[in-house]
Amino acid sequence: MHQFNFIKDRPNLNEVDDNLGKTPLKYFTEYIKDKIFPAISTTHEDILGFFYGEFIKYSGGDGQSLGIVLTPTHITELFCDLLEITPQDKVLDPCAGTGSFLVSAMNRMINSVETKEEKRYIKENNLHGIELKENMFSIATTNMILRGDGKTNLVCADFLKQNPQELRKDKYTVGMMNPPYSLRKNQETAYLSEIHFVKHLLDSLDDNARCGVIVPQSAMVGKNKEDKNIKKEILKNHTLEGVISLNGDTSFYRVGTIPCIAIFTAHRPHPQEKRCKFINFEDDGYKLSKHVGIVKTERAIERKEHLLRCWRDQLDAPSKYMVKSTIKPTDEWLHSFYYFNDELPNKEEFIITMSNYLTFEFDLVMQNKEYLLKDGNNYD
């Protein structure tokens, strides 16, 4: 546990805080002892991940410069629904962070079985993770041990240095990942792009494995030639099922990134005629509350249920919410790319649009540029 020696040396953790009336370290320790330990073995929340985030703030950073973005619980639970995780699945999270995906997957699995033997087998064999940063690896390991995992299958290693063919031998049926963001700075670090992490994970899974990743929307665009080539390689070997655009404020609070969830099927080449789902899930039933963060509203359950019914083809939806389309590697794999607003404008919208156009036309006339309005003109 030497990774946590920094706690002893951080003045912000060990000096009395006027608002708390004690040191933050003492406050957190007492809170964990009184509030967390009694319930941590059964809660669905990644509580240790939350406390890690608070410690990082007091230690002088938020982790974002390193691309660290912790995944909220309502997102990890949504992954379990979209990927339809069962007790028979073998899950891999190659960028495990504090273990939030694995915690949600564990809860989903053990709540679906009855005997202690089945639950023990799941905890000891069906949950696997890789994490590069030692401090988060320690938290993830602790997270799993506190939940009764007697054989934590976590490895402190660099996922991108792992041979996909070797990982395939472990026959992972589900992949879940929130890769580091924005680590690609130049040509030398191009291999650190989010889409490269996605391909590496897909290549590492078993045949027909389900894979879900949460990445910046820009990763689905193909920001440069290298990323576009990776998208092409992905479709040669794997199938894109769909992409769900999320609300940046209610997914990654204060990160400044607008994310999306992409769902794939591994080692099944993408059929040219396949129509993928592209969903706009910005209205997710959560809100951003000042001084609190992300807050669940009374609409959250209904919005999630609506999303899942659309995803499972149990419900049709207007194109402003969901579009089904064939794709190409050069496309931007996002709802905003495929969506065309074919709704008729109401009277007020029509008047505003016409007013704006007439103002634009009048300005051209006043500048003696009315020739630009005529059809067939070249503008040399």
Predicted regions and their residues:
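Conserved aromatic-histidine-acidic binding/catalytic patches
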Residues: 16, 20, 39-40, 64-67, ...
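A conserved structural/catalytic subdomain of Rossmann-like adenosyl-cofactor enzymes
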Residues: 166-169, 174-380
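S-adenosyl-L-methionine
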Residues: 45-70, 77, 81
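Short, functionally important structural connectors and interaction interfaces within domains
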Residues: 61-62, 124, 232
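Conserved S-adenosyl-L-methionine
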Residues: 65-174, 182-184, 188-191, 195-196, ...
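Long recognition/docking surfaces used for binding and targeting
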Residues: 1-59
